Amino acid sequence: MRVIFSGGGTGGHIYPIMALIERLKERKLVTNDEILFVGTDRGLESKIVPAAGVPFRTLKIKGFDRKHPLKNFETIELFIKATKEAKQIIKDFKPDVVVGTGGYVSGAIVYEAAKMHIPTIIHESNSVVGLANKFLAHYVDKICYTFDDAAKQFSEKKKLVKTGNPRSQQVLGLNKDNVDLAKKWGLNPNMPTVLIFGGSRGALAINQIVEKSLPELETKPYQVIWATGQLYYGDVKKKLAGKEISSNVKIVPYIDNMPGLLPQMTCVVARSGATSLAEFTALGVPVILIPSPNVTHNHQMKNAMDMEKAGAALVIAEDDLNPNNFVSSIDHILLDTNYAKQMSEASRRLGVPDASDQVISVMEGLIKNK
C-alpha cells in the first residue's frame, strides 16, 4: 500500500497521521518508503514529521485572512500554484490512497488526488469541521470523524464513517512505564491526585488560576501536580520564591511521559484540543476542561461541550474562571469516588480503542474497490 498523508499547522492535524503511520507499520501494511507526509515548512509538522524519520515534502500555501479580504488574492494564487505542485508530487509518488486531516495544505493535495481519481479520505478530529475539510468533503470518497456533532455538519451523509481519533489506539498500545509518583515527586500513589496542565508550552490563564487557588489547594486531602509549561515555569517559580509550598503540591515545567502518568490520575485539568481528548477518553480519565478561546470557530469549546454532554467532563469557560469554581470542580471529582467512577466510565465509552484500525479498514476498502 502506498499512502500520501497531509495535514498541517496544529497537533490536532498531525498526531492522528503519526498514529496511523505507526499502526500501518506495526501491521506491516507499509514500509517507510511507501508513505509520504505532505505539509508546510512553517507548521508544527515541519519539526515533528522529519524528527520521526517519516518522508516529508512541503507545499507553499497559507490560509484565508478573514480580517483583510484583499490579501486573499495572494492566498488564491498560492493555492493554484500548490495544486500544480501537488499534482506532480502525486504523479511521482503514485499513491494507492490519499488521506487528509485538515489544514490548508491538505486542501491542495487531497483535492488534486480526487481530481486524478485516486481514492481519498478526510479525517475530522474536532466537533467543528475545519474549512479545508468542509471544502474537501464534496470531492473525497470517505469522511472519517470522531464527534457526532461534526457528522451533522457534512451534507454528504453516505460518505461518513465514525472511526474515532487514531491517537486513542496509539495511547492504549504504548508500552508505557507508569511514572513512579513516590520516587519522582515524593507523592503517595494511593492518594487521589489531580494533574493540571495547559499543553506542552503551558496556558497563562490556567497558571494564573492555579496560583490564585494555591492556598486552598494546599489544604486539601488530595495531591496536585501542576505542569506550568516550559514557557511559564521560570515566572511561576519566581513569583512563588520564598513561599513554602505544601508537600501535596508539586510544580513541574512539563510532563515527559504523559501516557505513563495519565492512568494514575484521578482527574485532569486541561485544554480541550482533539489530541488531548483522544488520550483522555482512551484511558477513561475524568477531566475538567478549560477550552482555549484562541482557536478557530471556538472549536475547543464545542469539543468540551460534547464531552460534558456525555458525562465525561466538567467545563469552565476561561472568562468564568475563579478560585471558587475551579477548586470546587476539582473537589467534586476527587472527593466523590462514585462521581469520579461514573465520569471515567462515560469517558471510556467515548473512546475508540481501535480507531487506527477503523481508518485503515476504510483505506483498504477504497483501494480494493478502485
Curated annotation (Swiss-Prot):
Any one GO biological process: regulation of cell shape
Enzyme class: transferase
Gene3D superfamilies, sorted: Glycogen Phosphorylase B
Catalysed conversion reaction: Mur2Ac(oyl-L-Ala-gamma-D-Glu-L-Lys-D-Ala-D-Ala)-di-trans,octa-cis-undecaprenyl diphosphate + UDP-N-acetyl-alpha-D-glucosamine = beta-D-GlcNAc-(1->4)-Mur2Ac(oyl-L-Ala-gamma-D-Glu-L-Lys-D-Ala-D-Ala)-di-trans,octa-cis-undecaprenyl diphosphate + UDP + H(+)
Superkingdom of origin: Bacteria
Cellular localization per UniProt: Cell membrane
Topology in membrane: Peripheral membrane protein
InterPro entries registered for this protein in UniProt: GlcNAc_MurG, Glyco_trans_28_C, GlycoTrans_28_N
Binding residues for UDP-N-acetyl-alpha-D-glucosamine: 10-12, 126, 200, 255, 300
Annotated GO CC locations: plasma membrane
Pathway involvement of the protein, from the record: Cell wall biogenesis; peptidoglycan biosynthesis
EC number(s) reported in the record: 2.4.1.227
Keyword list, A-Z: Cell cycle, Cell division, Cell membrane, Cell shape, Cell wall biogenesis/degradation, Glycosyltransferase, Membrane, Peptidoglycan synthesis, Transferase
UniProt function note: Cell wall formation. Catalyzes the transfer of a GlcNAc subunit on undecaprenyl-pyrophosphoryl-MurNAc-pentapeptide (lipid intermediate I) to form undecaprenyl-pyrophosphoryl-MurNAc-(pentapeptide)GlcNAc (lipid intermediate II).
Similarity-based family: Belongs to the glycosyltransferase 28 family. MurG subfamily.
Protein name (Swiss-Prot/TrEMBL): UDP-N-acetylglucosamine--N-acetylmuramyl-(pentapeptide) pyrophosphoryl-undecaprenol N-acetylglucosamine transferase
Organism in which the protein naturally occurs: Lactobacillus gasseri (strain ATCC 33323 / DSM 20243 / BCRC 14619 / CIP 102991 / JCM 1131 / KCTC 3163 / NCIMB 11718 / NCTC 13722 / AM63)
